[in-house]
Amino acid sequence: MPWIQLRINTNSDDAETISDLLMEEGAVSITFEDGKDTPIFEPKLGETPLWRDTVVVALFEADTDLTPTIEMLKTLPFLGEHFSHKIEQIEDKDWVREWMDNYHPIQFGKRLWICPSWREVPDPTAVNVILDPGLAFGTGTHPTTALCLEWLDSLDLSNEEVIDFGCGSGILAVAALKLGAKKVTGIDIDYQAIDASKANAERNDVADQLELYLPEDQPADLKADVLVANILAGPLRELAPLIAERVKTGGKLALSGLLKEQAQEISDFYSQWFDMDEAAHKEDWSRLTGTRK
């Protein structure tokens, strides 16, 4: 059965309101697309990431008359009578299959692969992490996650203790354990992140080596040989003294979640405690690494 697709150009402030109205008008699905090629931070679990320029895409059944819907939208003050939109007919597809077909095993560095559960691992002898994409968060597809995974792959983590600060889905924690770490401590402010990390560790048979804490519950004397923090520039600056305290002398640090233009300022700030390396970049994003003084 074909469908009618309505595309509306708007902004992040109004996208959710338009989405709700279109659902009331009978839309069977709503998705958001980037109106321009702009970077977006990884969202927290449960959040919907939106760009400043957002396209709301609604699907309606083929026999739907959209004339009343368009007239209603014209009355909205933030859209107006001549709002930008497009209506077209599209053929039916197996949308679940198409979504699954978009995800393939991805290699990071020399040893590490992140594989959806429905795909066969390309190299059974490699270090394989099984992780299914859900939210656009912590699946390896975001440049900041990729930068951190590549860094972990480059290290000898044998018998090392690791802290994953802002563990999210647990992808970095699980990868570190699969790469040989003796123990990983994951810390996150979100209960959903703690649950997701636990579930992904169980799926990869490393749950007994992973300890998970909310920030207020982390042990006061916690220290590690390696610490990775894939969060954002603001929290990285605010948490710098605590992060430094958590890394043993001579220990390794990786920071990501940074746009290129933010990297130098954060690197300079962390140089109080770490000998900082040159930044690594992927697309618009950066990763900083250093060694504890």
Swiss-Prot record:
The keyword Cytoplasm applies. It is an enzyme of class 2 (transferase). Pfam families: PrmA. It catalyses: L-lysyl-[protein] + 3 S-adenosyl-L-methionine = N(6),N(6),N(6)-trimethyl-L-lysyl-[protein] + 3 S-adenosyl-L-homocysteine + 3 H(+). HAMAP family: Methyltr_PrmA (MF_00735). SUPFAM superfamilies: S-adenosyl-L-methionine-dependent methyltransferases. S-adenosyl-L-methionine binds at T145, G166, D188, N230. Its main location: cytoplasm. This is Ribosomal protein L11 methyltransferase. Belongs to the methyltransferase superfamily. PrmA family. One of its GO terms (molecular function) is protein-lysine N-methyltransferase activity. GO terms for cellular component: cytosol. Methylates ribosomal protein L11. It comes from the Bacteria. Keywords: Cytoplasm, Methyltransferase, S-adenosyl-L-methionine, Transferase. It comes from Shewanella oneidensis (strain ATCC 700550 / JCM 31522 / CIP 106686 / LMG 19005 / NCIMB 14063 / MR-1).
